[in-house]
A protein has these predicted regions:
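Intrinsically disordered, low-complexity regulatory segments of nuclear proteins
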Residues: 2-4
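Non-heme Fe(II) oxygenase metal-center motifs and adjacent flexible, charged/small-residue loops
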Residues: 8-283
């Protein structure tokens, strides 16, 4: 991938790196940026984008795997369905992990510049929950889209940051569209500002069908668990994710159908033990 000095991308890289002068300290925070057909600042709030008719297929994951391994990028394909331990037939579900995918796209040794670009933004620390505006403790959020939007939490609208302010995120988004041979997706940010306190429990992404995500910061595992009739079925699966890693979910692995009771569905979680330690849904 050729680099052209003087471009907006190059200037953003230089500015971001200067903003975090000195050696990078071990991060105690983890950021996840999720590219998908739909984004939202919090469950039940404004949705951005239109739901696609289908998610990524196993064949699409394989194409991405082969393209990147040919470029020397370490990739790992995981089958989730063999870990379902129930009585009924189960759909195949796959997860593709791309090691240091961010570094590969940006041609950097780390994610310092990308984290700095996000740290410069005014993150959503409030959300509308059960009719009330409350402080967000589990994580902070943002959505990225074509136009800026100031938050109106009482109306269920969070902050949206336009692509023009985030050239590094935009570059990765465009790369994802290219390698998947798909349209550019929306982007949703989850900022786990303290990995010892933050997280998200077992859930499926019922708002979207496509997930191609990137991580930056401290290492933090992604967990998966099969469910049926609201009960865990089979062992919990743990996938280690590190600074700059990307992951791509095949359609079933997204968990779009996670609220269905009778069929086997798979949910995912991440963060501290409060959110990931128990696979049983909170009553």
């Amino acid at each position: 991938m050729k680099r052209c000095r003087g471009t907006t991308f190059e200037k953003a890289m230089s500015k971001a790196v200067k903003a975090v002068s000195g050696a990078k300290k071990e991060a105690k925070k983890t950021y996840t940026l999720t590219c998908g057909d739909v984004s939202e600042n919090h469950h039940g709030m404004q949705k951005n984008g239109e739901l696609h008719s289908h998610g990524y297929s196993y064949e699409t994951l394989c194409k991405v795997y082969h393209k990147l391994t040919a470029e020397g990028v370490a990739c790992e394909m995981y089958a989730l369905h063999p870990h379902y331990d129930g009585p009924d037939p189960v759909e195949e579900a796959w997860l593709l992990v791309i090691r240091k995918g961010v570094q590969h796209v940006l041609q950097t040794e780390d994610t310092v510049a990308l984290m700095a670009e996000n740290d410069a933004l005014d993150m959503d620390k409030h959300a509308l929950m059960k009719g009330r505006v409350v402080n967000k403790k589990a994580r902070w959020n943002l959505c990225f889209d074509d136009e800026d939007q100031e938050p109106d939490y009482e109306s269920g609208k969070g902050r949206i940051v336009a692509w023009k302010h985030i050239p590094l995120v935009s570059k990765i988004r465009e790369w994802i569209a290219e390698i998947t041979e798909d349209v550019p997706l929306k982007v949703e940010a989850n900022y786990y500002y303290d990995i010892e306190k933050c997280g998200i429990g077992y859930h499926g992404d019922g708002e979207r069908r496509k997930v191609f995500a990137m991580r930056m910061g401290a290492s933090m595992p992604l967990y998966y668990q099969w469910y049926q009739r609201s009960e865990p079925v089979g062992p919990r699966m743990k996938f280690e994710l590190h600074d700059g890693d990307m992951y791509m979910m095949e359609a079933k692995a997204v968990g779009f159908d996670w609220l269905k009771k009778n069929v086997p569905t798979v949910r995912h979680a991440t963060g501290c033990d409060e959110y990931t330690g128990s696979v049983r849904p909170k009553k």
